[in-house]
Regions:
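Conserved tyrosine-mediated DNA breakage-rejoining catalytic core shared by Y-recombinases
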Residues: 20-56
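Catalytic-site neighborhood detector that most strongly recognizes the C-terminal catalytic loop/helix
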Residues: 35-39, 129-153
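Basic, Lys/Arg- and aromatic-enriched nucleic-acid-binding interface segment
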Residues: 1-15, 19, 108
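Short alpha-helical segment immediately N-terminal to, or the first helix within
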Residues: 7-8, 101, 114-115, 128, ...
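Active-site/catalytic core of tyrosine-dependent DNA strand-transfer enzymes
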Residues: 47-100, 105-107, 111
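Active-site-proximal segment of tyrosine recombinases
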Residues: 17-18, 102-103, 112, 120-130
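Short, polar N-cap/turn motifs at the start of nucleic acid-interacting alpha helices
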Residues: 25-30, 120-139
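Conserved catalytic core of the tyrosine transesterase superfamily
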Residues: 1-6, 37-38, 78, 145
């Protein structure tokens, strides 16, 4: 579960998508099947590593998972089951660290917030996460507002 957790943190994939992720540490990106909500078709996406250096340090090109899929053999039942097992593994460890209510989506949303602080173009970040730019702004609006306030303060308080 460690590889999956580290990969979700570095690339911001949905938990189910992480089972399909193939890192390319040379480019600092990966390929992953995007599993959009609703009845939209799955497609390939190219998540960005935040950061490439950390992906290399954690050796994420040494893939360690018992299950994988691609566009042609996705099993939603198995993927959901393994996602639940993954969460059962993480929750007690998170509590030990003082994080009482960890969900796998928290790891993904952490990537979204870090992408804003890293200055990644919102269009690129939303594609990396596999959602629309509108969804991106809806989810991360408060972070953009915080960054805007900080930047405005820096300009007027030189």
């Amino acid at each position: 579960w460690g590889w999956l957790t580290a990969t979700a943190y570095i690339f911001g994939t949905r938990s189910g998508e992480t089972f399909s992720l193939i890192p390319d540490l040379d480019s600092g990106t990966a390929t992953s099947v995007c599993i959009p909500k609703g009845k939209k078709s799955m497609y390939m996406k190219y998540p960005i590593a935040l950061t490439k250096e950390l992906a290399i340090k954690w050796e994420l090109d040494n893939i360690q998972r018992e299950y994988t899929f691609d566009l042609n053999d996705y099993d939603p039942t198995r993927t959901k089951y393994l996602g639940n097992q993954w969460l059962r593994y993480l929750k007690p460890r998170a509590k030990e660290l003082g994080i009482p209510f960890l969900e796998l989506t928290d790891i993904r949303h952490n990537w979204g917030i870090r992408s804003i602080h890293a200055g990644i173009d919102p269009r690129v970040a939303s594609k990396s996460l596999g959602h629309s730019i509108n969804t991106h702004y809806e989810i991360y609006n408060s972070t953009y507002e915080q960054i805007d306030s900080i930047n405005a303060s820096k300009k007027i308080n030189k």
